[in-house]
Structures are given as structure tokens and as C-alpha cells.
Amino acid sequence: MFQGASSLSLDAKGRLSVPTRHRDALTAQAGGQLTLTKHPDGCLMVFPRPEWEKFRERIAQLPMSAQWWKRIFLGNAMDVEMDGTGRVLVSPELREAAGLSKDAILLGMGNHFELWDKATYEAKEAAAMQAEMPDVFKDFSF
């Protein structure tokens, strides 16, 4: 399970360094094999390959009415591999789609990660914190 937020910098070639605390798990779980794709909220999803395969199967089974979402998730998916130093190359197309330039945030979301442009994430998080909490949390004990 992946959790927590990490501030990252993409280098000039569009590579990010996976935080050390996640490298061993990604190597053990997926041999360093990852899949990146678009997320409807404007970030990228980063899956260990076995989790991606499960997600891909679920998406592929959706009805024809979801064809465009299949295209968005599957058609934009890029398989990548961590190099020996834990770096991952994010394609120019996916960097552009998520508005990634240099400063980024990697969020552990359980079985996958979200990769956000830092400024975009901070703005969306601030807006969410100012908005009313969703009903699903009304009876949740903190």
C-alpha cells in the first residue's frame, strides 16, 4: 500500500526520482515496471504493472457508452521502467497533459500513485479544504 506525499523535481529530460521509501516495494511488487496514464482530475496515475493490469481489465470491460474514457485511460497509457537509480521517464505527452514542468507532488493512493504539478495540486487541495466536506464524511469519526 502506498501512502503519503512526496515533493519531487522533474529533470530537464522529464525524469522523476521515485522516493526511496517506495522503490523497494515497487521493485518487489512489479520489478520496477510501471504504467502511467491520464487521470480525469488533471494529474497522472502511476501504477505498478500488476495493479495496472487489474485496472486495465476493468476499463476494457466497460460498455461502449464509456468508449471515450477507455481511450483516455488505455490510449494514453505508457509503460515505463525505473532505472538503476530509481528514476522514471515521463513522456512529453503525459507531462503536457498533467501540466508538469519541474515541481511535482507524488501522492500514494493505496495501490497506485497520483503525480501532480505542485502548484495545481496545492490550489486544488486548498479549494477542497475550503469547500464543505462531502456527505460521505459526515458520520466519519476523526
Curated annotation (Swiss-Prot):
The keyword S-adenosyl-L-methionine does not apply. The keyword Ligase does not apply. GO terms for cellular component: cytoplasm; nucleoid. It comes from the Bacteria. Its main location: cytoplasm. GO terms for molecular function: DNA-binding transcription factor activity; transcription cis-regulatory region binding. This is Transcriptional regulator MraZ. It comes from Acidovorax ebreus (strain TPSY).
